[in-house]
C-alpha cells in the first residue's frame, strides 16, 4: 500500500494494484440500498436490538441489563435482519451525528425512531467501515437539524437516502474491508489478552488476601506463616482531606502536578506513578502528598464505584478536594490493593447517599482490615504491581492498535468535497 497524491476523489492510501484505477465515484445511498420498513405486525419477533455508538448493534437486554421496550408495543417496530444497517439519530460524544452500524448478530426488531436499510449487494462490509469514519458527517450536518430534544439529529428519509457514498471497484472495496477486518481480528485478540490478565489479577487478589472472617489467605508465599492481625483502619493510617483544585486551575504548563478526585475514576488504578494534570495554584494553598499516601474519593455516583483507592508513589503532588487522604504506617500500595479487593464491599456498605454518594473519614476509620507483617505486605504489593504493569502495557497496545485503525480508515477512503452547501 502506498500514499498517493490527494487529487480528485482518490484516497491518500491505496493498494498498488489499484493506483491506476482512476478516481472513485460518488453514488447516493438510495442507488446502493433500500430502506427496510417491514413492521413487526404480528409481534412474532421479541428480540429488541439497539444501535450504540460504542458497541454497534447489540441486544437491548445486554446493553441496558433489562428490557426497555415492552412486549405490547413491539408491533410498530421495524424488522431488522442480519446484514442490515441501521442509523440511530441520537447524538453523543462518540457519534456527533448519530451512529450507523451493521447488524452482525441476528434478526430482531428496532425502534421506529431508527432508519433501517439494506444494501443491494450482500458483500458490503466496505460500507460498514466507511460509516465508522467521519467522511459522511459533514453531509449530515448540512442536511439535517437537531431535534426538539436537542439530543437527536432530525433528517428526512429522502435526505438520508440521498447521502453521497464513495464507491470504487468491488475488488478494491473487498481489499479494504479485508485489510480492516484483519486489523479488527488483531485488536480483538489483544483485547482478549487484556481481559485474561484482568481476570487473572482478580482471581489472584482473591487468593492473596484472607476471605471474610479468616486471618490466613488461601495462597501464600512460602516464607510467611504467621497469622494476619485484624486492625481498624484508624490504627494504621492518619486521615486528612485534600484541598479544592477547580477545572479552571488546571494548566498543562503548571509547576505542580495534581490529582483531582474525578481522575480516580478515569485515569488511575491502585498505583499512581505518573500524574497527568498540573496546576499553578500556590503550593501554600494546596495539600501536598507524601510518597505512600493512599487516596479515596469522598463523593461519587454509586456506592460500589466510590469504593476505590490509589496509592500515590510520589512526593509533592497536590491532592484535590473531595479526596480522603490516608497517610499509612504500613505499605501504602498493599493498603490500596486490599481496599480495592476484599474491603471493597464493606466500603460500599458504609457510603451514604443516593443521587450523590458520600464517603466520610469517620466511616473509613472503623473498617476492619487483615494486615500481615511488613515484608509480606511488600511481597504482595510487588507481585500485584508487576501484574498491573503487564496490564498497563497490554492496554496501551490495544489503544495503539485502535488509534492506528482509526487513522488508517481516514486514509483508505477519499474525502468527499462536493456535499451540498
Give the location of each predicted region.
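Non-catalytic DNA-recognition/assembly elements of restriction-modification systems
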Residues: 10-40, 220-243, 366
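Short coil/turn segments at secondary-structure boundaries
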Residues: 42-50, 142-144, 246-254, 350-351
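A short beta-sheet element
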Residues: 75-136, 149, 260, 278-341
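Short, surface-exposed secondary-structure boundary micro-motifs
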Residues: 91, 179-181, 300, 383-385
Amino acid at each position: 500500500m502506498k500514499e498517493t497524491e490527494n487529487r480528485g476523489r482518490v484516497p491518500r492510501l491505496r493498494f498498488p494494484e489499484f493506483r491506476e484505477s482512476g478516481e472513485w465515484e460518488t453514488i447516493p445511498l438510495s442507488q446502493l440500498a433500500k430502506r427496510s420498513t417491514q413492521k413487526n405486525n404480528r409481534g412474532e419477533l421479541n428480540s429488541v436490538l439497539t444501535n450504540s455508538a460504542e458497541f454497534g448493534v447489540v441486544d437491548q437486554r445486554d446493553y441496558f441489563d433489562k428490557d426497555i421496550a415492552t412486549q405490547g408495543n413491539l408491533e410498530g417496530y421495524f424488522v431488522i435482519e442480519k446484514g442490515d444497517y441501521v442509523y440511530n439519530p441520537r447524538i453523543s460524544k462518540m457519534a456527533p451525528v448519530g451512529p450507523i452500524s451493521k447488524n452482525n448478530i441476528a434478526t430482531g426488531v428496532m425502534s421506529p425512531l431508527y432508519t433501517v436499510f439494506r444494501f443491494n449487494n450482500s458483500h458490503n462490509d466496505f460500507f460498514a467501515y466507511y460509516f465508522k469514519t467521519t467522511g459522511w458527517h459533514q453531509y449530515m450536518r448540512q442536511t439535517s437539524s437537531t431535534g426538539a430534544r436537542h439530543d437527536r439529529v432530525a433528517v428526512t428519509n429522502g435526505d438520508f437516502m440521498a447521502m453521497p457514498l464513495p464507491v470504487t471497484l468491488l475488488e478494491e472495496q473487498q481489499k479494504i474491508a479485508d485489510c480492516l477486518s484483519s486489523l479488527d481480528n488483531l485488536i480483538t485478540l489483544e483485547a482478549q489478552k487484556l481481559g485474561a490478565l484482568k481476570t487473572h489479577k482478580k482471581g489472584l487478589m482473591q487468593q492473596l488476601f484472607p476471605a471474610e472472617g479468616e486471618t490466613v489467605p488461601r495462597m501464600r508465599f512460602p516464607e510467611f506463616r504467621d497469622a494476619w492481625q485484624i486492625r481498624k483502619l484508624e490504627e494504621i493510617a492518619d486521615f486528612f482531606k485534600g484541598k479544592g483544585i477547580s477545572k479552571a486551575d488546571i494548566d498543562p504548563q503548571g509547576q505542580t502536578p495534581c490529582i483531582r478526585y474525578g481522575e480516580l475514576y478515569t485515569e488511575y488504578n491502585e498505583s499512581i506513578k505518573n500524574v497527568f494534570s498540573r496546576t499553578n495554584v500556590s503550593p501554600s494553598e494546596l495539600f501536598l502528598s507524601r510518597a505512600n499516601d493512599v487516596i479515596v474519593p469522598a463523593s461519587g455516583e454509586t456506592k460500589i464505584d466510590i469504593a476505590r483507592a490509589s496509592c500515590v508513589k510520589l512526593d509533592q503532588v497536590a491532592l484535590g478536594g473531595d479526596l480522603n487522604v490516608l497517610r499509612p504506617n504500613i505499605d501504602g500500595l498493599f493498603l490500596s490493593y486490599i481496599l480495592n479487593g476484599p474491603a471493597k464491599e464493606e466500603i460500599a456498605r458504609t457510603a451514604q447517599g443516593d443521587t450523590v454518594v458520600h464517603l466520610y473519614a469517620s466511616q473509613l476509620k472503623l473498617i476492619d482490615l487483615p494486615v500481615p507483617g511488613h515484608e509480606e505486605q511488600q511481597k504482595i504489593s510487588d507481585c500485584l504491581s508487576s501484574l498491573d504493569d503487564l496490564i498497563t502495557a497490554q492496554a496501551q497496545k490495544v489503544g495503539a492498535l485502535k488509534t492506528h485503525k482509526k487513522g488508517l480508515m481516514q486514509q483508505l477512503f477519499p474525502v468527499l468535497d462536493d456535499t451540498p452547501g
